[in-house]
Regions:
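Basic, glycine/lysine-rich polyanion-binding surfaces/domains
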Residues: 1-207, 211-248
Length: 248
């Protein structure tokens, strides 16, 4: 199976207080993970309202899975653990019993219906009958799908799907082409959510309760405007620029 774990890691948050705990940490409303919409994008901010992480979040049963780049996942997991206090929550970085891969909209039709039904809407998820596998349609101008779940079942599903010669996808390329941001070590604590368009892709909810950094994010929304916005462009260079470099 192609390994996308060099681009994408996962933090598992479980326990009876998991939803309440996550709600106080992220820019989006975790209660949106309903039966109709089981996935969201969300930011995780410092007290200054600047992004420390950008998550794709999905859920299987009462377990929440926060996807982010592996270069920050362990540190973010440890930071989240600092705020658990007395909450009945367990946080696990890179759980051993899960796996995942990506396919695009041209190949999703090759997935046999008897394996798992296909979601019809962006950021909607469907579950296999035994709830061991989740299939989520990602957002963007072109649809991509994240197949995620129990590692043994994912391996079986992958072998069945790829017998039809489906080609795997690149997570970072998907984000770039669909104007979805990401936060890496080099870009942590540099940008407020609006600077990388989180408010434009539904990753910030201005009606939810408090979370770390909310005051700065809300003040920009209601009283001002962001000094920066994210755009897609291309340039020819002799070498790749460092992440977070200024463009002049």
């Amino acid at each position: 199976m192609p390994n996308i774990k060099d681009q994408l890691d996962v933090i598992k948050i479980s326990g009876v207080d998991a939803e309440t705990f996550i709600q106080g940490q992220i820019t989006n409303d975790i209660s949106l993970l309903s039966e109709e919409k089981k996935s969201i994008y969300a930011g995780y901010c410092s007290p200054k309202g600047r992004l420390l992480a950008f998550f794709f979040i999905t859920r299987i049963d009462k377990n929440y899975f926060l996807f982010c780049p592996p270069c920050i996942s362990e540190a973010i997991s440890k930071r989240l653990s600092m705020y658990v206090l007395r909450a009945k929550v367990e946080i696990t970085c890179s759980p051993d019993n899960v796996d995942y891969f990506l396919i695009d909209e041209s190949d999703i039709q090759k997935v046999p219906d008897n394996l798992i039904s296909k979601p019809q809407n962006k950021l909607q998820s469907t579950l296999s009958n035994d709830k061991s596998i989740s299939l989520t349609m990602l957002d963007g101008s072109k649809s991509y799908y994240l197949i995620f779940g129990d590692n043994k079942e994912i391996s079986k599903l992958y072998d069945e799907i790829y017998s039809t010669e489906i080609k795997p996808c690149n997570w970072n390329e998907i984000h770039i082409n669909n104007l979805i941001p990401n936060i890496f070590n080099e870009t942590q604590d540099l940008y407020i959510p609006q600077s990388v368009n989180l408010d434009l892709i539904g990753a910030v909810n201005f009606k939810k309760g408090c979370y770390t950094g909310q005051e700065v994010v809300a003040r920009t929304h209601y009283l001002g405007k962001p000094k920066r916005r994210m755009y897609l462009g291309s340039v020819t260079l002799n070498k790749n620029p460092e992440l977070g470099s200024d463009i002049k």
